[in-house]
Amino acid sequence: MFCCVALSASAVELDSLGRDPNYVKSILKRSEKIVDNLGITAPAVKQNVLYILANRYFKLNDIYEVRDQKVKYAKAVLTGASKQAAIEAAELEKDATLYRCHFEFPASLSLYINDKQIDAIKDGMTYNSLQVQYESLVDMVPSLTEEEKKQIYAWYKEAR
């Protein structure tokens, strides 16, 4: 059992190869601001979590860049229904790719940190939009029951 955990929780490599050094530095700085608030005391764990988070930003950027290139091509070269179909296909491909890697991120983090810390990372990445949107909705619809509020919060959390 320990052998599998040790192999799974090995050092995380930063996916910086071929990336603009200034972009890498910017992503690391953004990621450090989030990771620094988690209370991680072990330097190796902190670095692994930092690299997982930075790699997530890189992966998200890569996915959106592919989509943007396909949309740009469609707008420049195609016309009419073909153009619209290519744009929609690029969006669907982006969504499918995002869905496929959606669970990979918290699973990787869970090797090093607990669920509360994972939620703190997600909140940091989304600028606490979960709480902001939830509180705004509850303020706009004061007639919500506690059960409805719990369900809405669960939906927002899942969407995050």
What annotation goes with each model-predicted range?
Residues M1-L17:
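Bacterial Sec-dependent N-terminal signal peptides
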